[in-house]
From Swiss-Prot:
It comes from Polynucleobacter necessarius subsp. necessarius (strain STIR1). It is found in: Cytoplasm. HAMAP family: Arg_succ_lyase. The keyword Transcription regulation does not apply. Disulfide bonds: none annotated. This is Argininosuccinate lyase.
Length: 472
């Protein structure tokens, strides 16, 4: 349907003088981004003010123009903050909406603001400014989660639990050591976040549409005013680059993968089949039919939202893969995946930073589980090696002992010394197994024996926590 009589066209687009008829109503709605790019409003104003100050310094616009622009922008900011700004679909996006209102308020000075600038470099600047602020917020929230993990790990540096491989009981570890594994993951995430921030903190403004501008602009002045570390080196790349958005979504995907792994374990541990932890009611929900249920909805949703963030990354990669230089309208589609990834990561981290300190640990259940499944079998093999037996022979001997215990429905620690020697097939070499072996076969002895950097011994866990706090 044609929109020639539509009220949305009462305001002409900034480019409409070239065309003989107004944009079709459906096309107008299809191409407008004002429905989602309003969140750029404050950074758009900041970028415009820095640009205007530079134009005045370079005598491209007058001091009076600058004063008028500053006054008008102050009013626009107040209107937006008060929810009184009238966004116009016909003006397409946040940039033209603000510029139109500015011109309405201050006249010709508003029309001069866009001198030496294109929406191409303007939106690229807004996107970086907005993402930088979001990255800084996420970095703080991620730090809060890391602190929460350190604090909980410190409380449970000596709490014994089973370590698993293939989701089968493998060896005894401490819960603090287990939590510190996630601290390491999230620390790598924090490092990646800092790296990508440093990489994209360059100013695109000044690239104009794609080739730069004929005006004697000072890009370094604008970069300094907006807190950028420098300017983009190539005008074509400046307006068409979305690597930073892709890189953020890659960071977000890896971080959410870590969150998802933690979530999966929280879900398992909360299950009565494990019974290792409990979560506060405020992080769980019930069932509409089963009155006994307490469901771990937060970790389940975090696990599910991980796929959503993966999708945001794939959307951006696909968006960019076939674009020739420089800017194309395709790039309008970069925002919603990025916004979604930022929002999902921030919300997830906030909830987990609040939830982790309130995890109730059921230490007795953890230790009991660690005492099952022959978790100290490797310790027995190591003991035999230290007595002079080759490791493969020791491995085979302990495997025989485990098989014997399975047949008798008992644990290694239930055997007497002579029974243990016989079960290992070493009754003809009694010197290889002495009474001291039973200390090593306890889960406490097993954990305490891992006395090296990165090991699960409580002293080593506390040392790792100390290093972690120093690195925050």
């Amino acid at each position: 349907m044609s929109s020639s009589n539509n009220s949305l066209n009462n305001k002409a687009q900034a480019w409409s003088a070239r065309f003989a008829e107004p944009v079709d109503e459906l096309v107008q709605r299809y191409t407008a981004s004002i429905g989602f790019d309003q969140r750029f409003a404050m950074v758009d104003i900041a970028g415009s003010l820095a640009h205007a100050e530079m134009l005045a310094t370079q005598k491209i616009i007058s001091a009076q123009d600058l004063a008028d622009i500053q006054k008008g922008m102050a009013q626009i900011q107040s209107e937006i903050e008060a929810g009184q700004f009238e966004w116009q679909l016909a003006l397409e996006d946040v940039h033209l909406n603000i510029e139109a209102r500015l011109t309405q308020l201050v006249g010709d000075a508003g029309k001069r603001l866009h001198t030496g600038r294109s929406r191409n470099d303007q939106v690229a600047t807004d996107l970086r400014l907005w993402l930088r602020g979001s990255v800084d917020e996420i970095a703080l929230t991620l730090k809060s989660l890391r602190v929460a993990l350190l604090d909980l790990a410190e409380k449970h540096a000596s709490t014994i639990m089973p370590g698993h491989t293939h989701l089968q009981v493998a060896q005894p570890i401490t819960f603090g050591h287990h939590l510190m594994a996630y601290f390491e993951m999230f620390s790598r995430d924090a490092s990646r976040l800092a790296d990508l921030r440093a990489r994209f903190n360059r100013l695109p403004l000044g690239a104009a549409a794609l080739a730069g501008t004929t005006y004697p602009i000072n890009r370094e002045q604008v970069a300094k005013a907006l807190g950028f570390d420098g300017t983009c080196n190539n005008s074509l790349d400046a307006v068409s680059d979305r690597d930073f958005a892709i890189e953020f979504c890659a960071f977000a995907s890896i971080l959410m993968m870590h969150v998802s792994r933690l979530s999966e374990e929280l879900i398992l541990w909360l299950s009565p089949r494990f019974g290792f932890i409990d979560l506060p009611d405020r992080f769980c929900t019930g069932s509409s039919i089963m009155p006994q249920k307490k469901n771990p909805d937060v970790p389940e949703l975090a696990r599910g939202k991980t796929g959503r963030v993966y999708g945001d990354l794939i959307s951006l990669l696909t968006l960019m893969k076939g674009q020739p230089l420089a800017y194309n309208k395709d790039d309008q589609e970069d925002k919603e995946p990025l916004f979604d990834a930022v929002d999902t990561v921030q919300d997830t981290l906030r909830i987990f930073a609040d939830m982790v300190p309130h995890i109730e640990v059921k230490s007795e259940a953890m230790k009991k589980a660690a005492e099952e499944g022959f978790a100290t079998a490797t310790d027995l093999a190591d003991y035999l090696v230290k007595k002079g037996l080759a490791f493969r022979d020791a491995h085979e001997a302990v495997a025989h002992a485990v098989k014997a215990c399975v047949g008798r429905n008992c644990m290694l620690t239930d055997l007497s010394l002579s029974e243990l020697r016989f079960a290992c097939g070493l009754d003809n070499r009694p010197e290889l197994i002495g009474d001291d072996v039973f200390v090593l076969l306890t889960v406490d002895g097993s954990v305490q024996s891992r006395q090296h950097a990165g090991g699960t011994a409580p002293a080593q866990v506390l040392a790792a926590i100390k290093r972690g706090r120093a690195d925050l």
